[in-house]
């Protein structure tokens, strides 16, 4: 190995332990990551404790000697690397992208003249993505004029230049060039896809200028373009196309789901809305466009009783429920409405006026109280109560997980759940705590309904651990609960003491309550990674090899900094190898490399029965994700 040439790929710190990934020169281009400088190194074989191991064409080692830093802008360096590369297929993509990105077209020329081929079908990066803003037009022209070498699809170049640049001279040149070589490009589709990528519905001055260039060059279908511009409400292009005399069928335009603003452009140019065209507008529009257009048609009295049929009413109910109120106010819909459907929609949308309308037309509010509770909204439910509704517990649908959402966390809903014995206080609190923003007032309200000093929350420990694991801190709501609101168990008190740095109290609680071998406390201590606290636990459990094996497994998930401490300072060696390898797969890459460098087999065994592993069962109980394994409480 000593006679080989190596380059440094990456340095990783593992606490106070450094690991280096180095690569032999012949595999350099297989692993380089968008760098313009590289460091030649050699393993420091003479250092005490030196280790090295192979890792998929690269090597892991703990000691290196840096020899020199080289630049990939230096031709001699590049030639030497290329000459030593074993597999030259597709290796030049990085270099071309690097030189394009840095405006080094002279170096691209050198690669081309040296016949170092760019292969767009290889795994190298897309060279167009690296075109810099500075000198963008010149770089694009370079790619276009050398595309017989780059072999990028002309459609991809056209899409990039037209959709993502403001280089109008380049656009003009490219379109004319493609005409000369008889290359057919679907510019209409490019334009449409560009609008979709911009989420549409907004005028883009620069892109509009591009479209005008394409119109001038006569490479787009004006009728198709008008349709696209109408759909995406591109006012400037619609106006421009009409100004240059583009022919169109007004009713066809109306079928394009146009906005009110676009509609007015056509009306201001002499187009007339008759009953047929109004029907088209009413039957094809949905969403916010329909709401605006509908209000305009109502205000201008285009909509008459004759046009209001069941089909229109159904469209409004299904897709634009908020505008139903205006129809109700002006027209007789008594024979056109399914009041059951409308009442449920009104409850879902909290449309109090529509609810009142249904009630005034004979709807029995009591038939919908259960439905309103299932789709609870406080203002809507209160309104139904004020209208004489009473809630029956028969067939009442209650979902405990609803309490994890803000709209259910109010006194009215909580009282209904408690007064009707739909759930226990413990479960109510458990679910209230699951809400991300946490409603302190509601939690206090629930606690004040009972003697909270006697309440036991069996899932609280797991919630605290899961919260700390995912956030690397503890939410104040758990600290408040443990300290003042309830009578927590000693495990909860110990865990809160550890995560709040009150280690003396934690040690006292552990000793007084014989919790020295509790795995949940151990896992939190591993995550906290306080050396003194860990030594305290290890000294008590020094004779329990099983406990020490748990510490190593937890360190792979909880805090990788602790791995080196547990392995080298405490002297724990992995023995539960199936669990060890399984957790290793879910652990951080740095952790895996540490074990590999220290001579351990980290290959994955068959995982068919992994659910039976004790460590998997532990995390399943906590509700902690392990890679592809998803656990919920």
From Swiss-Prot:
Superkingdom as given in the UniProt entry: Viruses
The keyword Repeat appears for this protein: yes
SUPFAM superfamilies in the record: Pseudo ankyrin repeat-like
ATP-binding listed as a keyword: no
Keywords: ANK repeat, Repeat
ANK repeats: 91-120, 123-152, 221-250, 252-275, 338-367, 369-393, 517-546
Protein name as annotated: Putative ankyrin repeat protein L774
